[in-house]
């Protein structure tokens, strides 16, 4: 639209507009623009050096953090082994505790049964003692009766004589004597019962003493079981404390991993290294040219970061996941930066193509209207257009790096002699550009890993 408006304005105007002074002013403006570009290039070199230093510091921090993560992983493995051993011991203690509880229940049942038998025996003993007292009282009464019988008067002599005579004439005298002795030797049933009860009492007393001894031993075993149970409960409490400590250590390891992934990964490497002042809108012409120069640099092949020390090699799956996430984020960030550079180049290309069309149309109109101008002026204008097109094609070819072709002042022939300041300024511009390009190449050779991650 602007080109059409300008063409319409030039069609409406009939007076000549082309002047060599305007051309010289444009060249001087271009020289000033180149000087500003050089200043900006120095600033970019300083920022790039700062980025190199920050990247080296971040690499050292990452190596230190990887060592810490490895140490934490080893500690976690040791704690896991300790926890496994504690779990095994806890299971064994639980099994022994269950066995002891079962034994204590059985012993309590035995104690109850023994107490019941003791009570029964005590009742039997009381009953037998009462019977013994009754028998004693009855025996005492019989003894009194015998004493009374002995106190009776003796039989008369005549009666004794008769008895003696009868005994002499008795045929079965020995049998009678045996019967008398057997009757005297036979005990009464009360006495037999008394002796039987005495024997039972002695047996019961012996059983009672045995039961008391058993009761004392069972009580001692019960106390030992209670002590072991309390010790097992204390050990279980210690295992709970160990488990809580294990959970705390696992939480600390997870926090360290999150801090490692959030604070010092290579995911946001390009965003941290490249300042935000470089990515501004395209309205500023010098900034757009600088971005074109910066993005047209040769893109080095991506290589993952290699660590030389074997101690920092992460053998577990967590380290592999971190490396994979890091590579994916680097690839995504490189694609985003490349897309941004492509969009900037496309915008520069469109604006340059529009300006080129306008310039060619104006040149054609000037050639048609100003036939009186010399052939040299026309030739200089064509050479300028060729040089500008060459510069744009070199800026678009970003794979081989941005290397502007120096415009020799001898090739530009004008009707009037060009000022020497213009020539010196352009020579200074191109020499500085070559020098900065060489310095950038040297820095890339010094830091190949940084160049691989910065793009």
From Swiss-Prot:
One GO cellular component term noted in the UniProt record for this chain: cytoplasm
PANTHER family: CENTROCORTIN FAMILY MEMBER (PTHR19232), CEREBELLAR DEGENERATION-RELATED PROTEIN 2 (PTHR19232:SF1)
Residues with the Phosphoserine modification: 310
Keywords for the protein's UniProt record, in alphabetical order: Coiled coil, Phosphoprotein
Originating species: Mus musculus
Tissue specificity comment: Expressed in brain and testis (at protein level). Expressed in the cerebellum, cerebral cortex, heart, lung, spleen, ovary, kidney and testis.
Residue stretches of biased makeup (Polar residues): 132-142
Similarity comment: Belongs to the CDR2 family.
Chain positions covered by the region annotation Disordered: 132-152, 395-419
Compositionally biased region (Low complexity): 403-419
Name of protein: Cerebellar degeneration-related protein 2
Coiled coil: 37-141, 191-264
């Amino acid at each position: 639209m602007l080109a059409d408006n300008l063409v319409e304005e030039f069609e409406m105007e009939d007076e000549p507009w082309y002047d060599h002074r305007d051309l010289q002013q444009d060249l001087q403006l271009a020289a000033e623009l180149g000087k500003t570009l050089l200043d900006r290039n120095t600033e970019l070199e300083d920022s790039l050096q700062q980025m190199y230093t920050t990247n080296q510091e971040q690499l050292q921090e990452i190596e230190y953090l990887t060592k810490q993560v490895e140490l934490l992983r080893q500690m976690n493995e040791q704690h896991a082994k300790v926890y496994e051993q504690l779990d095994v011991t806890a299971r064994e203690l639980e099994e022994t505790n269950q066995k002891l509880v079962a034994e204590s229940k059985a012993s309590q049942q035995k104690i109850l049964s023994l107490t019941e038998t003791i009570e029964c025996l005590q009742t039997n003993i009381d009953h037998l003692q009462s019977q013994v007292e009754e028998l004693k009282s009855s025996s005492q009464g019989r003894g009194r009766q015998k004493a009374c019988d002995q106190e009776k008067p003796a039989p008369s002599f005549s009666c004794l004589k008769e008895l003696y005579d009868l005994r002499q004439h008795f045929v079965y005298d020995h049998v009678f004597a045996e019967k008398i002795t057997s009757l005297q030797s036979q005990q009464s049933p009360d006495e037999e019962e008394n002796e039987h009860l005495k024997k039972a009492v002695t047996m019961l007393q012996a059983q009672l003493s045995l039961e008391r001894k058993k009761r004392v031993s069972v009580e001692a075993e019960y106390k030992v079981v209670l002590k072991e149970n309390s010790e097992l409960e204390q050990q279980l409490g210690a295992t709970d404390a160990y488990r809580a400590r294990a959970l705390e250590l696992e939480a600390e390891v997870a926090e360290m991993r999150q801090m490692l992934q959030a604070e010092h990964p290579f995911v946001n490497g390009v965003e941290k290294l490249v300042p935000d002042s470089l990515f501004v809108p395209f309205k500023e012409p010098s900034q757009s040219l600088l971005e074109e120069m910066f993005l047209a640099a040769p893109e080095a092949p991506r290589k993952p970061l290699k660590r030389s020390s074997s101690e920092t090699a992460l053998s577990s799956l967590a380290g592999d996941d971190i490396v994979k996430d890091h590579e994916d984020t680097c690839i995504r960030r490189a694609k985003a930066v490349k897309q941004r550079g492509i969009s900037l180049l496309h915008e520069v290309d469109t604006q340059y193509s529009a300006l080129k069309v306008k310039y060619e149309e104006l040149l054609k109109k000037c050639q048609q209207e100003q036939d009186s101008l010399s052939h040299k002026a026309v030739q200089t204008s064509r050479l300028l257009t060729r040089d500008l097109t060459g510069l744009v094609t070199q800026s678009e070819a970003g794979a081989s790096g941005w290397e502007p072709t120096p415009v020799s002042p001898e090739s530009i022939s004008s009707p009037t002699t060009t000022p020497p300041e213009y020539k010196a300024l352009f020579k200074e511009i191109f020499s500085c550009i070559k020098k900065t390009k060489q310095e950038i190449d040297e820095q890339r050779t010094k830091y190949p890993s940084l160049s691989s991650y910065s793009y």
